[in-house]
């Protein structure tokens, strides 16, 4: 799938993450800013990438600003950003529940 527009989800508050997705033509690029990047950076990137793979999104630039978000928050923010970027308003919860657990 291809993103139709730039989309953002999340906040800059403590224990949250702001995910911004921008369409590109060069593949997946994840730019991460996090105070815990040395400890958890690879795990954060892997979670973001796994959500994008579920939606079959390959050409996207991800700008992620982490403020100590838990795994479930990272996944949720990425899902919301994808739906916004695709211009979808109806969430397919049954499908999401199959692969998010």
Curated annotation (Swiss-Prot):
Transmembrane segments: none annotated. The keyword Chaperone does not apply. The keyword Cytoplasm applies. InterPro entries: CitD, Mal_deCO2ase/Cit_lyase_ACP. Pfam families: ACP (PF06857). One of its GO terms (cellular component) is cytoplasm. Keywords: Cytoplasm, Phosphoprotein. The modification O-(phosphoribosyl dephospho-coenzyme A)serine is found at residue 14. It is found in: Cytoplasm. Its main location: cytoplasm. Covalent carrier of the coenzyme of citrate lyase. Oligomer with a subunit composition of (alpha,beta,gamma)6. Belongs to the CitD family. This is Citrate lyase acyl carrier protein. It comes from Latilactobacillus sakei subsp. sakei (strain 23K).
């Amino acid at each position: 799938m291809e993103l139709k527009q730039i989309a953002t989800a999340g906040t800059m508050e403590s224990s949250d993450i702001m995910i911004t997705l921008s369409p590109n033509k060069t593949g997946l690029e994840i730019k991460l800013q996090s105070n815990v990047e040395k400890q958890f950076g690879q795990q954060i990137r892997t979670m973001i990438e796994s959500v994008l793979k579920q939606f079959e999104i390959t050409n996207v630039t991800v700008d992620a600003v982490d403020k100590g978000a838990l795994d479930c928050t990272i996944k949720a923010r990425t899902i919301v950003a994808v739906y916004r970027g695709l211009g979808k308003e109806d969430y397919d919860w049954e499908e999401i529940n199959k692969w998010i657990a």
